[in-house]
Amino acid sequence: MKRVLIPGVILCGADVAQAVDDKNMYMHFFEEMTVYAPVPVPVNGNTHYTSESIERLPTGNGNISDLLRTNPAVRMDSTQSTSLNQGDIRPEKISIHGASPYQNAYLIDGISATNNLNPANESDASSATNISGMSQGYYLDVSLLDNVTLYDSFVPVEFGRFNGGVIDAKIKRFNADDSKVKLGYRTTRSDWLTSHIDENNKSAFNQGSSGSTYYSPDFKKNFYTLSFNQELADNFGVTAGLSRRQSDITRADYVSNDGIVAGRAQYKNVIDTALSKFTWFASDRFTHDLTLKYTGSSRDYNTSTFPQSDREMGNKSYGLAWDMDTQLAWAKLRTTVGWDHISDYTRHDHDIWYTELSCTYGDITGRCTRGGLGHISQAVDNYTFKTRLDWQKSAVGNVSHQPYFGAEYIYSDAWTERHNQSESYVINAAGKKTNHTIYHKGKGSLGIDNYTLYMADHISWRNVSLMPGVRYDYDNYLSNHNISPRFMTEWDIFADQTSMITAGYNRYYGGNILDMGLRDIRNSWTESVSGNKTLTRYQNLKTPYNDELAMGLQQKIGKNVIARANYVYREAHDQISKSSRTDSATKTTITEYNNDGKTKTHSFNLSFELAEPLHISQVDINPQIVFSYIKSKGNLSLNNGYEESNTGDNQVVYNGNLVSYDSVPVADFNNPLKISLNMDFTHQPSGLVWANTLAWQEARKARIILGKTNAQYISEYSDYKQYVDEKLDSSLTWDTRLSWTPQFLKQQNLTISADILNVLDSKTAVDTTNTGVATYASGRTFWLDVSMKF
């Protein structure tokens, strides 16, 4: 696979022309260099995945998270996708250089696609106020995309409102020379995988749930895609992509008090995607793009021990954008206008949730709970206007400049709504209602203005390049004026690209969490007989930010080996957490958000790959080895994020010692050292491609909260929270993908692919409890993929 490498981005195959055109607006200091690499890796903080890269990688459920899984700057939550829940198809959370998974910026064609309503709440529990969210506003199918760029460090000044990184997905643009239709089908099922389940979890796993935690004992996944590229008139055309990803999961429909399964039912997990872009090359000076986008996700649940508790939870996002590029005599002007609607919802089949102390329902006798809690949702409409002006390069003596300036305005109309009245209560032995709560119908909103200005300059002198920049952000949600300096320098030591050094300092201010402002609106509709109230305080918060020091090295070894090393140090400041207290006089529970969270992260990666593939008997061989190490310490749980309530503790007991809380290693996303060997074999005459990844992960630790009944609990430290780490063994996994495009069917362009994930069927523990119950990663898994272009 051919790769074209520009400092700051890897470009691949047939996508080079468009990608280079896009990147010319950004960093392009030196001449291009060709490399061959099975898996894209960061170059000066940018990793570029083209459609060719996406087709090569085993992308599992087809989400952006699956695509980024092998990136050395990224860590996944290893407890999110396990042997217990392989039927789930939702995107997984990612942490970039140890930052909060809820502080990444997701973009589609440069416009924000981040869901900042309440991304830390991924609970599927049945509740009157629970609306599950996720930081990815659009659940994109990566097979429909032109390319994806991850900015993990040295992030350019035009990107903001993040702490971790930026993920920018590009929708395919019309190409008059490539009018094709593509059909695709991809599938797997529970019969095609090995599940490793702890004996203590087997009963709940076979039932399909434990309380509000859902498992996938029996499922079938079927993914369908259709895409096309069509010229409509001279210099005017359209691309479109449609997909449905569906997982049908069979779980217990009803479980009696004594654990008897009384019937099973099928529950659907569906993600629909529709993307389209109309392009008009009006002249040599003007190009227009009109982009339409939609994703809809829905998941069916019930609480198996509660009759009539069926509900649907999901996300719907849609929007449009108009983009105009204008080539002036002295500069290039880009103007973008967009609108995006992002929403999350929970819709129960019933509006009343009640408990009877004495009832009979099927096999249940005695106390039982049944029903639902109505329909509730929250959403945000973002109206975006942005513009950017890039001056042509000018020179004074040996020094050249290429400055650019930009501005952005986003109006966010965030709202929450209870669509119907619902209520909950308990019927006591006398047949009377107690603990009665009414959730009234209502709707409320808040409007937020977001302003951004930025400027930067590409300065080159001989074989040294500098890019200083500064970004200013303000919004009337937290009313903070945030100034972000960005600086990067690059030195081509011998002016021949054999030895290059990059270094820089950058600051990244995060985005807002809108649920803090919507929560009191939603809670105001709750009428409790007890008179209990809730109050949320967030108005005096600072905007969380990360300071970054980074360095990159690139060295050509001999004629054909490229070595790259990157080091990133991050300090996270003013991270949001919370504390709660109850005012007994007013019966008010007050939740107050604060800026007590902080972390420090050291991140290092090293890779070796070839400038040209090895040619042996008509077979191209592309080897690559990648080392990655990320270690964080701090007083913040990344999974809990802004809902973390422990950061006020100055000291805790950790592994038997009383220590400062912020000196304790971060427990989640804790996979420090990873080494992967990637090896591609391509036989052009037959159309066979065999891609392999062999990955080793060092032994890790699972964090356990100790209670007084645990043997490790130290009674003399009873005033402190106590934690202990349990060792999880190292792991070795092998993923492989075999693709065949028969050369005798060139006109049909048929491709058949098979993925085998975890070929060795390694049994890897990813978590354990304080009672010793382990959770394991998925075992060996088979996928089948068929596509045709015509």
Stretches found by the model and what they are:
Residues V181-R189, A240-R244, L290-G296, T335-H341, ...:
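Transmembrane beta-barrel strands of outer-membrane/channel proteins
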Residues S143, V157-F159, F174-V181, E231-F236, ...:
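Short loop/turn motifs that connect adjacent beta-strands in outer-membrane beta-barrel proteins
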Residues N116, K578, G687, A695-I714, ...:
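C-terminal beta-signal and adjacent terminal beta-strands/loops
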Residues S123, S298, N476, F494-Y545, ...:
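Surface-exposed extracellular loop regions of Gram-negative outer-membrane beta-barrel proteins
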Residues S179-K180, T213-S298, N315-K332, V626:
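Transmembrane beta-barrel wall of Gram-negative outer-membrane proteins
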Residues L275-S298, R311-L478, S603-P613, S617-S628:
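Face-selective signature of the C-terminal outer-membrane beta-barrel domain
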Residues S460-S465, Y567-I576, D583-K708:
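Gram-negative outer-membrane beta-barrel transporters
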Residues D22, V39-P156, V166, K170-K172, ...:
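Periplasmic N-terminal accessory/gating domains of Gram-negative outer-membrane beta-barrel systems
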